[in-house]
Amino acid sequence: MQLNPSEISDLIKSRIQNLQLAATSRNEGTVVSVTDGITRVHGLADVMQGEMLEFPGNTFGLALNLERDSVGAVVLGEYEHITEGDPVKATGRILEVPVGPELIGRVVNALGQPIDGKGPINAKLTDKIEKVAPGVIWRQSVSQPVQTGLKSVDAMVPIGRGQRELIIGDRQTGKTAVAVDAIINQKGQDMFCVYVAIGQKASTIANVVRKLEEHGAMEYTIVVAATASESAAMQFIAPYSGCTMGEYFRDRGQDALIIYDDLTKQAWAYRQISLLLRRPPGREAYPGDVFYLHSRLLERASRVSADHVEKFTNGEVKGKTGSLTALPIIETQAGDVSAFVPTNVISITDGQIFLDTDLFNAGIRPAINAGISVSRVGGAAQTKVIKKLSGGIRTDLAQYRELAAFAQFASDLDDATRKQLERGRRVTELMKQPQYAPLSVADMAITLYAVNNGYFDDVEVPRLLAFESGLQQYVKAKNPALVTKIMTSKELDADGEKQLVAVIDEFKKSWA
């Protein structure tokens, strides 16, 4: 069969007209260099700050440096398989992590992936790790307490729901112990907890998880772990991931407590990333925005109004306020609270619990230094009975420390000074508390009432804690109705006081 030229041209024209090409537009670049988990990517246009980039092998990275002709990105996870010339795709999405009640009782990494070997987490929702903190209009003042179960904290530096209270001290002073005790004491308090472990040994995190399981605390706790063996990028994003998981409860009219253990290691990880990205170093080689690193995280902890909750849930939850309470931990070097990161976080938070090495070594645990520990907003949230009974405790301790230092040089002391020293010695002893043994409000009220009214004054110091424990058990056995009344009303009225005095007097007679 032969075709003439006109037929051939008609055939070609019809083919061209009927040609359909499926064109897909894709923002793609090429890896120029890979060093220590940092990649430089050339050819990516329209990339957002913090956008997720997709590398070969189902690996993702975060775009952190947006420069004129390249993008500096940090790889989340393993980067050994990424080589120069590999294609990189922009996803157009900001990093999100799974949120919701499905995560409760699980141990996850900074990306919300389970690492506890208990199978997948079928979370229905995800949320961005970087979010804007609630505005002033949507906040409410702190007025409800977070009971830690520690006498020295609840009496001297009370914490309220929605507060940010810093726990600061040298290594091995019991910072994590205070935080873990606070989590254990939330059992039955209608509070969800998130424990974020940053840059710690995997064995240390496993110990904390085991203790939480032993005390039944994993029933309301999520553990986010970025271990020391993980990349700096994972340690940097872990607190933001944990915060997003906590905000899920806050924005739905529930209460949550988040512990960042510790933010010093997050600052180190961020410093490492920034130096590798060739950002100019500042004080202590930290980048210029290290204050913003922590302020944007800690400002997300707040108590939000019922209007915020109603708006967020589209009217499903009405008349309930939500809160996210943060307990960030900072590790100091040789007690230097004037270093860069400690001063930053002190200025951001609503108070600090300072743990002292000397007190810890002297056996006073928790080793809280009453002189420089403070809670700027917690007083308004303190339980009524504890507030009423704890007034003189802090002053007694602070004055005792000063007098004790002075008394070392003075040979003869007047009666008033000797009396004050004796009282200070007893109050110091009574503030001691074993780990994983948080006290109820009623137990605390019994101890504080007894110490304020001189019932411990004639008990020898070594026997004080045994006397205190015996007294608490005796009151519970002899007058359970009074204990229940204190627990429910959170107050000690004149009638309750009369009953308590009678029981304490009875106990003192039987105590030998």
Swiss-Prot record:
What this protein is reported to do is described as:
Produces ATP from ADP in the presence of a proton gradient across the membrane. The alpha chain is a regulatory subunit.
Show the taxonomic lineage: Bacteria, Pseudomonadati, Pseudomonadota, Betaproteobacteria, Rhodocyclales
Positions annotated to bind ATP: G169, D170, R171, Q172, T173, G174, K175, T176
Q: What SUPFAM superfamilies does the record point to?
A: C-terminal domain of alpha and beta subunits of F1 ATP synthase, N-terminal domain of alpha and beta subunits of F1 ATP synthase, P-loop containing nucleoside triphosphate hydrolases
Name used for this protein in its record: ATP synthase subunit alpha
Q: Where in the cell is it found?
A: Cell inner membrane
Query: What PROSITE patterns does its record include?
Result: ATPASE_ALPHA_BETA
Keyword line: ATP synthesis, ATP-binding, Cell inner membrane, Cell membrane, CF(1), Hydrogen ion transport, Ion transport, Membrane, Nucleotide-binding, Translocase, Transport
Under the subunit heading, UniProt states: F-type ATPases have 2 components, CF(1) - the catalytic core - and CF(0) - the membrane proton channel. CF(1) has five subunits: alpha(3), beta(3), gamma(1), delta(1), epsilon(1). CF(0) has three main subunits: a(1), b(2) and c(9-12). The alpha and beta chains form an alternating ring which encloses part of the gamma chain. CF(1) is attached to CF(0) by a central stalk formed by the gamma and epsilon chains, while a peripheral stalk is formed by the delta and b chains.
What is the organism field in this record? Aromatoleum aromaticum (strain DSM 19018 / LMG 30748 / EbN1) (Azoarcus sp. (strain EbN1))
Under catalytic activity, the entry for this protein gives: ATP + H2O + 4 H(+)(in) = ADP + phosphate + 5 H(+)(out)
Which GO terms label this protein's molecular function in UniProt?
A: ADP binding; ATP binding; proton-transporting ATP synthase activity, rotational mechanism
Q: Which GO terms describe its cellular component?
A: plasma membrane; proton-transporting ATP synthase complex
Main localization of the protein described in the UniProt heading: membrane
Q: Which domain of life is it from?
A: Bacteria
Enzyme Commission no: 7.1.2.2
Q: Tell me what topology the record assigns in the membrane.
A: Peripheral membrane protein
The record's comment on protein family reads: Belongs to the ATPase alpha/beta chains family.
> Hey, where's the site called Required for activity on this chain?
S373
Q: Which InterPro entries match?
A: ATP_synth_asu-like_sf, ATP_synth_asu_C, ATP_synth_asu_C_sf, ATP_synth_F1_a_nt-bd_dom, ATP_synth_F1_asu, ATPase_a/bsu_AS, ATPase_F1/V1/A1_a/bsu_N, ATPase_F1/V1/A1_a/bsu_N_sf
Pfam families named in the record: ATP-synt_ab, ATP-synt_ab_C, ATP-synt_ab_N
